[in-house]
Regions:
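Positively charged n-region of N-terminal signal peptides that target proteins for export
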Residues: 1-4
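Transmembrane beta-barrel domains of Gram-negative outer membranes and organellar outer membranes
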Residues: 21-139, 144-149, 154-172, 188-195, ...
Length: 269
């Protein structure tokens, strides 16, 4: 049953007729919703555009709210946190180059993303390819250099409603070699010009005790900023820690951890 979920959602990306166009020409891209280049933890297929800079800050608290989190430790907010900072540069209209550093195991993620197609009246999908490497600088980490590749697919179904499917491979996770998985994403609008975003990564069937990872975020776009309040069970924010359901930080299916993302875009024209 678990294996059917990505297949069903992938099929949903390919309807008989495309969504209602929001642009005049049949190949003019539909207007994007403010998802950014990263949904919650995983990459979207969207690029920044030429000569644009994006700065990303992530914060994931270590203490689960439902395991010892209470008013005395502000429901886990007094605990330590994994912090990440990233930069992405629009090197060309359809090409982004990015670097992201997570404090957990000093994990650097270097990547390039190329936007192949963008959804339009006669193009039902947005398609991008992304490739790069995670490099962990913490001494003692096994297989610290971990190449990866992704096919990033998205379809805008209605205003604020987006479905994302991202078949992905990474050479090494904490416990797997040549791990493949299909992260899924969904967004839908709520009052106040905000979005609810959902990410789900199925447990990896190549590892018996792999766990499903899930995250939910309340996302608000204000000017050149995107602010997200995040809840989820895993602290992983890099692909090598996500795809295997075996993050070295450890997590349980029913954990609920809080966090936030702050994104700021700059234009240099």
């Amino acid at each position: 049953m678990r294996a059917l979920v990505p297949a069903v959602l992938l099929a949903a990306l390919l309807p008989v007729s495309p969504a209602a166009a929001q642009s005049a020409g049949p190949y003019d891209p539909v207007r994007r919703d403010p998802l950014g280049t990263v949904l919650i933890n995983g990459a979207t297929p969207y690029t920044l555009g030429s000569r644009r800079l994006e700065v990303l800050f992530t914060h994931r608290f270590q203490q689960p709210v439902n395991q010892g989190g209470d008013s005395h430790n502000l429901w886990g907010l007094d605990s330590g946190a994994d912090v990440g900072i990233g930069l992405a540069w629009g090197a060309a209209p359809h090409l982004d180059l990015s670097v992201y550093r997570a404090s957990f195991q000093e994990d650097f993620e270097l990547a390039g993303k190329f936007l192949v197609l963008e959804q339009a009246q006669r193009l039902p999908l947005t398609v991008a390819v992304r490739a790069g490497v995670d490099h962990l600088r913490r001494p003692g980490v096994e297989d610290p250099t971990r190449p990866f590749a992704q096919l990033l697919l998205a379809r805008k179904l209605a205003l604020g409603v987006n479905l994302l499917v991202s078949p992905s491979w990474v050479r090494d996770t904490p416990r797997l070699r040549n791990a493949f998985n299909v992260p899924l994403g969904l967004s839908f609008p709520i009052p106040g010009n905000s979005l609810i975003e959902i990410e789900y990564i199925p447990a990896n069937r190549d590892l018996g005790d792999s766990l499903d990872a899930w995250h939910v975020a309340l996302s608000k776009s204000v000017g050149g900023h995107i602010f997200e309040i995040v809840a989820g069970n895993s602290r992983a924010t890099t692909l090598d820690q996500m795809l295997g359901g075996d993050s070295a930080a450890g997590f349980r299916k029913r954990d609920v951890r809080l966090g936030f993302n702050i994104v700021r875009d700059f234009s240099f024209f």
